[in-house]
């Protein structure tokens, strides 16, 4: 049995491993319970296990594309692992989902300048940038 209180007790004791075991147990029973999923990624990040946190958050982003918090958590792990291009992409999606399209566009432009991307990654960024610019233009007041 997993409860948020038990997880918090384990985290307060500094036993992130026990907290994660409780969370994973809870997720086997309630696989879509987002508070456990947030807590799992957060505990991995707090323990400095950013590669594992990144793997978890990438799965969550695939499953819950419209959850800005998962994108933010993914961005945090990308920053910790030095993946600048992907960091800016993740932040762009977070900002977009929060309704701040200009900030999302800025992040995609930073991703373009970050370098290190292959042709496919750069094409994805360019396409997303084009879509966001179109959406922003359609929201502008008509004269």
Question: Where are the model-predicted features located?
Answer:
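Short, small-residue-biased leader/transition segments that mark boundaries at the very start
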Residues: 1-3
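Helix-start (N-cap) detector for alpha-helical repeat units in TPR-like alpha-solenoids
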Residues: 17, 34-35, 68-69, 85, ...
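Canonical positions in the second alpha-helix
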Residues: 26, 59-60, 94, 111
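Alpha-helical linker/edge segments of TPR/alpha-solenoid repeat scaffolds
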Residues: 50, 80-90, 120, 130-143
């Amino acid at each position: 049995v997993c409860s948020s209180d038990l997880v918090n007790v384990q985290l307060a004791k500094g036993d992130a491993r026990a907290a994660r075991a409780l969370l994973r147990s809870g997720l086997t029973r309630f696989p879509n319970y987002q508070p456990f999923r947030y807590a799992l990624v957060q505990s991995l990040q707090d323990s400095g296990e950013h590669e594992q946190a990144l793997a978890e958050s990438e799965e969550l982003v695939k499953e819950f594309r419209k959850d800005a918090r998962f994108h933010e958590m993914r961005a945090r792990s990308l920053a910790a692992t030095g993946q600048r291009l992907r960091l800016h992409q993740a932040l762009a999606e977070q900002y977009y989902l929060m309704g701040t399209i200009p900030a999302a566009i800025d992040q995609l432009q930073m991703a373009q300048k970050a370098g290190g991307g292959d042709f496919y990654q750069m094409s994805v960024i360019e396409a997303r940038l084009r879509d966001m610019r179109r959406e922003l233009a359609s929201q502008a007041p008509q004269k």
